[in-house]
């Protein structure tokens, strides 16, 4: 579904009708009704716009049979909290085609960064193997009858890797830092359903206190929305909504999130080593509140840009998972280790027509 995409219209007026349908969809209190309205908008776009759908993507990969409980979903990065390997050394070996651009939740935009943050940090909730939102830093949460106010109750045993407690203030600070126009976060828009967030993010209102996220006390976070968002609890697992320790972030300045030591962690693992364009390692976090559920001691990731080199590493048992490119699918598709997965990305061609640049 291409929600919120603008387009050049063949007829010159249907783009307004499309935008009207999208705005109506966003205002629907029931998710099923919202999807129906989005479907109407999508149908109108495909019939009227200079847009041609191309592909809906997926992925194929190989994974060793001794690896278990390592999973991801289309909108969630690989999660290793519950992962295990059936061998004496509890170590997972992986590759990545690129290095980590940043581990600053306010500035990350890519899958590598989000994967590292998902496993070294924790938000209000975590997504489990059944794609359900389960307690993370929040022990429980509730919504108001009109669906516009969410209240999260935080656990009292969550700590940062420097020993500080993780509090509701860490979430309020983090979200407002992301929305601050000076941060220039590319993902600030994802918070626009929060009262005052859009106006603050776009610089139309310079008062951060106008944003509807507030630490009522150290262990209670209140969020006010402009419309009911039925999936808001799941959204809390997304990397942009992770907490940040204000004192630490400000002490690091521009180096925050750029090295293993210039970042704090509150998740199942810590980033223990990071050698740029070579490798990085995550180690089990002894201060994580649910440390007993973490089975792996270490996750090592080597930067390997060539797909065939990566496959060679897999075949020689140097790594435990590897992506399979389309030209190699036939070679491996009958293997017990071959797996496929749907992706949430849809690619389309948008032609610059009807509105020439001046």
Locations of the language-model features?
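Extracytoplasmic/periplasmic ligand-capture domains
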Residues: 1-44, 48, 127-129, 146-151, ...
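Long beta-strand-rich cores associated with HINT superfamily self-processing modules
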Residues: 2-5, 61-91
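Bilobed periplasmic-binding protein-like "clamshell/Venus-flytrap" ligand-binding domains
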Residues: 29-64, 94, 230-236
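Extracytoplasmic
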Residues: 49, 89, 119, 136-138, ...
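N-terminal lobe/hinge region of extracytoplasmic solute-binding protein
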Residues: 61-62, 95-145, 264
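Surface-exposed ligand-recognition segments of extracellular binding domains, strongest
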Residues: 68-69, 131-159, 189-247
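Immediate post-signal peptide segment of exported/extracytoplasmic ligand-binding proteins
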Residues: 82-95, 164, 265, 292-297
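Gly/Pro-rich hinge or "lid" segments in bacterial periplasmic/extracellular proteins
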Residues: 108-111, 129-132, 208-210, 218, ...
């Amino acid at each position: 579904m291409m929600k919120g995409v603008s387009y050049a219209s063949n007829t010159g007026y249907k783009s307004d009708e499309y935008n009207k349908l999208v705005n109506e969809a966003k205002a629907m209190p029931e998710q099923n009704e919202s999807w129906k309205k989005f479907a109407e908008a999508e149908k109108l776009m495909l019939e009227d716009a200079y847009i041609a759908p191309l592909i809906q993507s997926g992925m194929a990969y190989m994974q060793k049979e001794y690896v278990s409980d390592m999973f991801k979903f289309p909108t969630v990065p690989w999660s290793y909290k519950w992962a295990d390997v059936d061998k004496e050394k509890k170590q997972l070996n992986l590759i990545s085609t690129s290095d980590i651009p940043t581990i600053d939740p306010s500035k990350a935009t890519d899958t590598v960064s989000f994967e590292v943050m998902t496993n070294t940090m924790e938000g209000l909730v975590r997504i489990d193997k059944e794609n359900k939102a389960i307690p993370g830093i929040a022990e429980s949460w509730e919504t108001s009858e009109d669906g516009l106010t969410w209240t999260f109750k935080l656990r009292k045993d969550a700590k940062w890797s420097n020993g500080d407690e993780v509090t509701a203030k860490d979430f309020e600070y983090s979200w407002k830092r992301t929305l601050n126009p000076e941060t220039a976060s590319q993902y600030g828009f994802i918070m626009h359903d929060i009262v005052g967030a859009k106006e603050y993010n776009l610089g139309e209102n310079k008062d951060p206190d106008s944003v509807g996220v507030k630490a009522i006390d150290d262990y209670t976070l209140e969020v006010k929305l402009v419309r009911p968002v039925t999936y808001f609890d799941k959204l809390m697992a997304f990397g942009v909504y992770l907490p940040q320790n204000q004192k630490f972030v400000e002490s690091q300045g521009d180096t925050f999130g750029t090295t293993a030591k210039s970042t704090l962690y509150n998740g199942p693992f810590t980033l223990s080593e990071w050698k740029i364009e070579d490798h990085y390692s995550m180690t089990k976090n002894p201060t994580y509140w649910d440390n007993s559920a973490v089975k792996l001691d270490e996750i090592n990731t080597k930067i390997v840009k060539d797909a065939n080199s990566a496959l060679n590493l897999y075949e020689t048992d140097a790594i435990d998972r590897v992506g399979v490119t389309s030209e190699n699918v036939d070679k491996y598709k009958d293997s017990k280790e071959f797996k496929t997965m749907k992706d949430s990305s849809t690619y389309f061609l948008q032609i610059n027509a009807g509105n020439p640049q001046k």
